[in-house]
């Protein structure tokens, strides 16, 4: 892909309307200054003094952050937060981002806000060191009233969205946004509007998902197909092509240091190698940047290979951003085209 083609595609980004349906969480970073360590008089244990707190949307919010960085015109998060302090912070963080519309984002007292609290030891001249993470999650099934509200929102957005991203981040099925009931609604939407790009990603795998575009890693592809855990690139290509033909939708597979692979229902397959490393890396957020960039590129009319190239560059940019869940702007990506 040459620079002019890249510019032509990304020039369409401000016109796109993209919905993100999934589990939004609050990423809260607590920056600890080890030089200010004290000892608790009550317990005798070390006290870590937090000198800075920063928060940003995480999980599905990480995809949203990437869409914002890419300059997407209208971004509609479909999910929920609790009626709590973390929910207030999450809504405030979402609302502050360009292009984000909270018309379909539910705040409810029936759920708590999904939160990742990440203590970081920060010292001058050194990379931040992350300590044990503190998570707040929902462990009970998502109430039917909340599910119905979310499904109604998805149906409304499907009428004129350019793309829908499904992001299932929870560890326990039926406790988040992407429930069996919501997936049934997605199946109806996909059948009613087959030209609509719907791309799905789930940390628990995509088994049982309707026929939409799949994005997964190699281990998830193995689990989905019952194949061996360690596969060659050629074996992954065959499996991805088979799944794409069976579902009638594209399949994308992230291959870590081997790059990205995509397969179309027609049998077309493309593999784009990863960019060389340019220093220390942090892979957190890499997969979400791939999801965001594949979606935007495809919605703008990019070919299979073009979308993979743009996503591979974005992923490379993100993994070189340390101490945060990074994003890649159009300018960042353009530098490597």
Language-model segments: which ranges?
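Short glycine/threonine-rich catalytic loop with a Thr-x-Gly-x-Asp
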Residues: 276-294
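Ribokinase/PfkB-type carbohydrate-kinase core domain
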Residues: 1-38, 42, 49-281, 300-304, ...
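Solvent-exposed, amphipathic alpha-helical segments
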Residues: 289-297, 301, 314-321
């Amino acid at each position: 892909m040459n620079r002019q083609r890249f510019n032509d595609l990304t020039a369409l980004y401000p016109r796109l309307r993209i919905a993100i349906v999934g589990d939004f969480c609050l990423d809260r970073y607590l920056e600890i200054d080890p030089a200010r360590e004290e000892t608790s008089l009550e317990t005798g244990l070390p006290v870590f003094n937090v000198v800075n707190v920063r928060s940003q949307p995480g999980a599905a919010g990480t995809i949203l952050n990437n869409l914002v960085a890419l300059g997407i015109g209208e971004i509609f998060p479909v999910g929920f937060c609790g009626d709590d302090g973390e929910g207030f912070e999450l809504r405030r963080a979402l609302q502050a981002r360009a292009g984000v519309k909270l018309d379909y984002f539910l705040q409810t007292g029936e759920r708590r806000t999904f939160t990742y609290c990440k203590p970081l030891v920060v010292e001058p001249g050194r990379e931040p060191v992350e300590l044990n993470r503190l998570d707040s999650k929902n462990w009970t099934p998502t109430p039917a009233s909340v599910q119905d509200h979310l499904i109604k929102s998805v149906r409304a957005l499907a009428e004129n969205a350019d793309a829908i991203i499904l992001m299932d981040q929870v560890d326990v099925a039926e406790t988040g946004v992407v429930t069996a009931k919501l997936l049934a609604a997605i199946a109806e939407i996909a059948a009613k509007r087959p030209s609509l790009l719907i791309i799905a990603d789930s940390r628990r795998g995509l088994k049982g998902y309707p026929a939409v575009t799949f994005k997964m890693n190699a281990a998830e592809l193995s689990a989905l197909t019952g194949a061996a855990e360690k596969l060659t690139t050629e074996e992954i290509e065959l499996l991805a092509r088979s799944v794409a033909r069976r579902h009638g939708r594209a399949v994308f597979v992230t291959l870590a240091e081997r790059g990205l692979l995509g397969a179309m229902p027609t049998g077309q397959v493309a593999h784009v190698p990863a960019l060389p490393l340019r220093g220390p890396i942090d892979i957190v957020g890499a997969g979400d940047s791939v999801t965001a960039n594949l979606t935007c590129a495809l919605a703008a009319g990019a070919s299979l290979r073009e979308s993979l190239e743009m996503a591979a560059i974005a992923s490379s940019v993100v993994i070189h951003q340390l101490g945060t869940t990074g994003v890649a702007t159009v300018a960042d990506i353009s530098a490597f085209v």
